[in-house]
Amino acid sequence: MTDNSSISLTPADLEHVPLQPTRLKQVGGDQACIKLSLDAREQTALDALAAKVSHAFVTGAGGFLGKAICQRLIAAGIKVTGFARGRYLELEALGVTMVQGDLVNPEQVKQAMQGCDIVFHVASKAGVWGDRDSYFCPNVKGAANVIAACKALKINKLVYTSTPSVTFAGEDESGINESTPYASRFLNYYAHSKAIAEKMMLDANQSSSTNAAYVLKTVALRPHLIWGPNDPHLVPRVLARGRLGKLKLVGREDKLVDTIYIDNAAYAHVLAALELCQATPKCQGKAYFISNDEPVTMAKMLNMILACDGLPPVTQRVPQMLAYAVGAVLETAYRLLNKQEEPIMTRFVAKQLSCSHYFDISAAKQDFGYSALVSIEEGMKRLKASL
């Protein structure tokens, strides 16, 4: 269990005066026939979940992971309400009822969650650049609003998508497990805000042993580097820089990293949700690292992605200290120029790319039966076919 003593939540963390709020808009969609290629184990888990829940609420439904979760829930016959700032017509076509709104608006969140019996809180502001409020408002206040709505509406199952960044302090993470405490010093607002939100989620969990009529059960999952076909983040960035010949490795030695294929990340969320449906869930009130459980060097991972598009492997290296110095200079310049886009290098990225990041996922295996369905090798075949 993670040591939460280094995380504190103050009233300032929840303060937010929103911009003109997005007007809540609901648009329905007819149930569509979805053809997903599901592993027998995933199909079994989905069938079991469909027997326990009838209506799921998914924040960040239009995102890479959120969409994958929605597709599986709909395929299992579970009604899905998706919550996002945009409409996402492709989800409506699948049968997802999309609700447009803002996580920082508690009334919009509560209204959208009416009638649901399980919540997947996937949405977050991710990145390494931007001011504090741009991360804390959606990530911390948004999480608080989701928890409050669950309690107000008596929704008793809440699955939260966290991140391994909550433990990263700029040092190697080699086979760490959930006993590793939150970082003593956070390297960006994203990691800090997600750590606070994760702690809120776990603190909101209520013991199943109580005789109370309503008990909220929560779990947090920490997927690392989600990738696969239609990935809007890692894969396109690697390929774009690879095509320009600007991709470089950071550090003198290869460090191992864990990643997770998109189908595996969605499957882990389904399994955790199913475990929460038990009378005494093993996973409630806990956080879990999840990955493909196949640590590879950063060079190998990048080169496998490049090979999917017929691009040559990356071989050039930049010393970690040089990358860090360049990141510091760029950060200063971007702030002075008030540039909103993310610099191509930051101090955090330099640290991240030169450290190992792989995890002991034994707890996820033991508590809710997770293991990867799709290997990296098979995932790369699917990625190549999609490009």
UniProtKB/Swiss-Prot annotation:
The keyword Ribosomal protein does not apply. One of its GO terms (biological process) is steroid biosynthetic process. The keyword tRNA processing does not apply. Gene3D superfamilies: NAD(P)-binding Rossmann-like Domain. It is an enzyme of class 1 (oxidoreductase). The active site is at Y190 (proton acceptor). It holds the Pfam family 3Beta_HSD. GO terms for molecular function: oxidoreductase activity, acting on the CH-OH group of donors, NAD or NADP as acceptor. It catalyses: a (2R,3S)-2-alkyl-3-hydroxyalkanoate + NADP(+) = an (R)-2-alkyl-3-oxoalkanoate + NADPH + H(+). Its EC number is 1.1.1.412. InterPro entries: 3-beta-HSD-like, 3Beta_OHSteriod_DH/Estase, Lipid_A_modif_metabolic_enz, NAD(P)-bd_dom_sf. Disruption phenotype: Deletion of the entire oleABCD gene cluster leads to the complete absence of nonpolar extractable products. The oleABCD deletion strain shows a significantly longer lag phase than the wild-type strain when shifted to a lower temperature. NADP(+) binds at K194. Keywords: NADP, Oxidoreductase. Involved in olefin biosynthesis. Catalyzes the reversible stereospecific NADPH-dependent reduction of 2-alkyl-3-oxoalkanoic acids to 2-alkyl-3-hydroxyalkanoic acids. The S.oneidensis oleABCD genes produce 3,6,9,12,15,19,22,25,28-hentriacontanonaene, which may aid the cells in adapting to a sudden drop in temperature. Belongs to the 3-beta-HSD family. This is 2-alkyl-3-oxoalkanoate reductase. It comes from Shewanella oneidensis (strain ATCC 700550 / JCM 31522 / CIP 106686 / LMG 19005 / NCIMB 14063 / MR-1). The lineage of its organism: Bacteria, Pseudomonadati, Pseudomonadota, Gammaproteobacteria, Alteromonadales. The gene is oleD.
